[in-house]
A protein has these predicted regions:
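Blade-terminus and WD-like Trp-Asp/Gly-His loop motifs, strongest in beta-propeller folds
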Residues: 43-51, 106-115, 160-170, 241-250, ...
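Beta-strand C-termini and the immediately following turn/loop, strongest in propeller blades
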Residues: 54-59, 116-128, 171-177, 208-213, ...
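Active-site-proximal cap/loop segments of hydrolase catalytic domains
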Residues: 59, 88, 98, 549-559, ...
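Asp-box/WD-like beta-propeller blade repeats and closely related beta-sheet repeat scaffolds
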Residues: 102, 127-135, 141-164, 173-210, ...
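Short beta-strand element of the alpha/beta-hydrolase
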Residues: 524, 531-542
Length: 767
């Protein structure tokens, strides 16, 4: 009954907001409006959930970047935000800084009375290098105080912040000021020369080493009143650090990498160390060779950690004791056919007919550290750390598509329940659930069509902080109690948008050419009329399911276009087939629905989506206009390019996003098959290709290749270069507006021009 009431209340709130918005006179959503849409990020929440530190960001304030300095450790890209301190009880908002600041991080003291704030200032005088400034905001006095800086060292721009339990000090990372000069000199050497030598005998790629040197930091405890620093750990390449709950020690991940790792993007071999906070004495707990490839989950007191290795869960203490398996692999029968010892914890799965071997992942410890949440394809388990007994609390079906989308948020402080976000697989029904560990009952706290994000539970377990939207408008920040019996809106970030015409969205199901069920997100043209067909633009990437405000879709739908984000089923080895199998099937479905005009189909994508777009139009001529933004077209030339990203462009096809499945020399035919440039002669769709000359990810040479190829072949193509731009090509407010308007103009010219009369009787079947 209570859940039904809560659903009804939330639905009424959504309806009231929608009705109020529809009652206002509306105007078109423009390219200029795209730069005005504010978004919120939560920096930290007090332990009792009463206050939230959040940053509010507008694209308008961050439109210009010096992209030529990508990879320069002494350059900071703009991240200009308004810092807000929000009282979650009253909704009152304080802004400690007048105007915009570049907030690096922020952390509340244990009592919630003070907030440490680290901000960055670029090209600080007199050094000419960016500098960090540390401030403390006192909630009682509503006063902002700058923490005095040291003479020879400064708080590192990549520092974490952590208060000691008594609030007497803030643990920070410090950086020697002389390191900045050396880093900038190395950057200039790599970019300006005049002579640059690269050697395969060097252990590191040059750009990889430059980035790692930025981790050289020391750790100290800073007195927030005087700025006096008490050293804890001398300078080292520190990847990350955390202070224990009682403040007695730090756990430190120290970079011990000996050479560039081609197996992982930004691969780092870390050593796990424990450092006494009082004496600075360090002790190695896990060597780099043992830690490699592991993700550690920590107990609340910081004295135990767990990890999964080859699907088996281990727990280990910081006292140097050996790791202990909590999910031992079933023992194999001996030569005489003896069965494994049934008394062995975890040796049996409960299925006596088939003791299937499960592969587990670790999620989190209970607050007291006595239990672990682990997951497998069979479900969610609670495992007792003491004796490794495990209890299945959320069973899952073998067919993943029949299970809800579940993501753990955290344990209740008393360990009685686990909270998770929940989403249906076949419709927009989403929310938050409470899973009772003892009874295994899953209780919906809130469940409706709204889109929930960034859900976090305060440490005391009494307050949820989250973002929510109706799926068509930008999200705002909300708070609710642990039962979701009351939800309160904390921000109104975009009140002006109530006067704008926005599209409505719909989840559309379809089957690809192989019969696999897929989903995509349709946004209808503003002022859509049922029974009338519209030009439609397909925006490609990988998979889509949830809606949510999309500024570009809002802009295009205001000009009479439907916009569809289709999903595809990507297969390692031959991913290129997925788009023609999936996107054309999605087009067929939208034509069947009476939404899409079959003669006015457009397609576009950015980065991987741009790559997909050009590859798609080499396989079908159904699309009458295409736009490639920062997408590759030549897998061979792309393979070892983009040096500032280290091994990213070799790793992507070998092991990750591009899904080729091996090196260029393992599968040369796959690289050729997925290079649109080699099939440019098959392209009949007019192509607009857009790039930024300073793109460190997908070089502008990729757009250059396809432009000159299509021009040579007599095809219709246009190449737009933003000389100062990068992977996001526009690099100013004016360029951002130009970018969106150029894309619109391309579609206006090719999807809305009068069609020539054709003999429809001669039309053949379409792929």
């Amino acid at each position: 009954m209570h859940t039904a009431i809560r659903r009804a209340v939330m639905a009424l709130v959504v309806l009231a907001v929608a009705s109020a918005a529809s009652a206002q006179p509306s105007s078109p959503f423009t390219a200029e409006d795209m730069l005005k849409v504010a978004s919120v990020s939560v920096l930290d929440v007090t332990e009792d959930g009463s206050r939230v530190a959040a940053s509010v960001r507008l694209p308008f304030d961050n439109a210009t970047v010096d992209n030529r300095r990508y990879g320069d450790p002494t350059y900071l890209s703009p991240s200009n935000v308004t810092l807000q301190i929000i009282d979650a009880r009253t909704g009152a908002i304080d802004t400690p800084f007048k105007g915009l600041v570049s907030v690096r991080t922020a952390a509340w003291s244990r009592d919630g009375k003070r907030l440490a704030i680290l901000i960055a200032q670029d090209a600080a005088v007199p050094s000419g290098f960016p500098s960090a400034k540390l401030f403390v905001w006192e909630t009682g006095r509503k006063a902002l105080t700058e923490v005095p800086a040291g003479a020879d060292t400064a708080v590192a721009l990549n520092s974490s912040l952590a208060w000691t339990p008594d609030g007497a000090a803030i643990l920070v990372a410090l950086r020697d000021r002389t390191q900045d000069a050396a880093a900038r000199a190395k950057f200039r050497e790599l970019t300006e020369g005049p002579i640059v030598v690269h050697k395969s005998t060097d252990p590191f790629l040059e750009w990889d080493l430059l980035g790692r040197d930025n981790r050289s930091r020391s750790i100290a405890a800073l007195d927030p009143r005087t700025g006096a620093a008490r050293p804890i750990l001398p300078q080292a390449r520190i990847s990350s650090y955390e202070v224990s709950r009682d403040g007695a020690f730090l756990r430190v991940m120290e970079d011990a990498t000996e050479k560039t790792d081609y197996e992982t993007i930004g691969g780092t071999d870390n050593v796990l160390k424990f450092v006494d906070a009082a004496t600075g004495q360090a002790r190695t707990v896990m060597a780099a060779k043992d830690l490699k490839g592991l993700t550690l989950r920590w107990s609340d007191d910081g004295r135990w950690f767990a990890y999964a290795k080859k699907g088996e869960v281990f727990v280990q203490g910081i006292d140097g004791s050996a790791p202990r398996s909590l999910t031992p692999k079933p023992a194999k029968a001996d030569a005489k056919g003896a069965e494994p010892d049934a008394a062995t914890p975890g040796a049996r799965t409960g299925d006596e007919k088939k003791p299937a071997e499960e592969s587990f992942s670790v999620r989190s410890f209970s607050r007291d550290g006595s239990r672990l949440l682990v997951t497998s394809r069979k479900g969610w388990y609670v495992v007792k750390v003491a004796d490794a007994t495990r209890d299945l609390i959320v069973p899952l079906q073998e067919d993943e598509e029949k299970n809800p989308r579940l993501t753990a948020v955290g344990w209740s402080p008393d360990g009685a329940a686990i909270y998770a976000t929940w989403g249906a697989r076949d419709k927009w029904e989403r929310g938050v659930v409470r899973i009772d560990v003892a009874s295994k009952a899953m209780t919906p706290l809130v469940r409706d069509a709204r889109l929930y994000g960034g859900v976090r539970l305060s440490r005391d377990g009494g307050t949820f902080i989250f973002t929510a939207s109706d799926g068509d408008r930008p999200a705002d920040l909300y708070t609710a109690d642990a039962r979701f019996s009351s939800a309160k809106k904390l921000t109104d970030l975009n009140p002006w948008i109530a006067g704008k015409s926005l599209p409505r969205s719909e989840l559309v199901a379809y089957r690809d050419a192989d019969g696999k069920r897929l989903y995509g997100v349709l946004r209808y043209p503003v002022n859509y009329e049922k029974g009338r067909t519209y030009p439609i633009i397909f925006e490609l990437y990988e998979t889509f399911f949830d809606n949510g405000f999309n500024a570009r879709a809002a802009f295009l739908t205001n000009h009479g276009y439907a916009v569809f984000h289709p999903s595809v089923n990507l297969v390692v080895g031959q991913p290129g087939e997925a788009w023609v199998k999936g996107v054309t099937s999605a087009a067929n479905r939208l034509i069947e629905m009476g939404v899409a005009d079959p003669d006015k189909l457009g397609v576009q994508g950015t980065s991987y989506g741009g790559y997909a777009t050009v590859l798609l139009i080499t396989q079908t001529d159904r699309f009458k206009a295409a736009v490639n933004v920062s997408g590759k077209v030549d897998m061979v030339s792309f393979y070892t390019d983009s040096p500032r990203l280290g091994v990213r462009n070799t790793h992507a096809p070998e092991k990750s996003q591009d899904r080729i499945g091996g090196t260029l020399w393992d599968y040369p035919e796959r690289y050729l098959d997925h290079s649109a440039i080699l099939r440019a002669d098959r392209i009949k769709t007019p192509l607009l290709t857009i790039s930024g000359d300073q793109d460190p990810n997908v070089p502008a040479s990729q757009s250059r290749e396809i432009y000159y190829a299509l021009r040579r072949l007599g095809k219709e193509v246009e190449w737009v270069r933003y000389v100062n731009g990068a992977h996001r090509p526009p690099d100013s407010v004016a360029e951002s507006i130009d970018f969106e308007q150029r894309i619109l103009a391309w579609y206006e010219a090719h999807l809305k021009k009068p069609e020539k009369k054709t003999d429809t009787s001669a039309l053949g079947a379409r792929r």
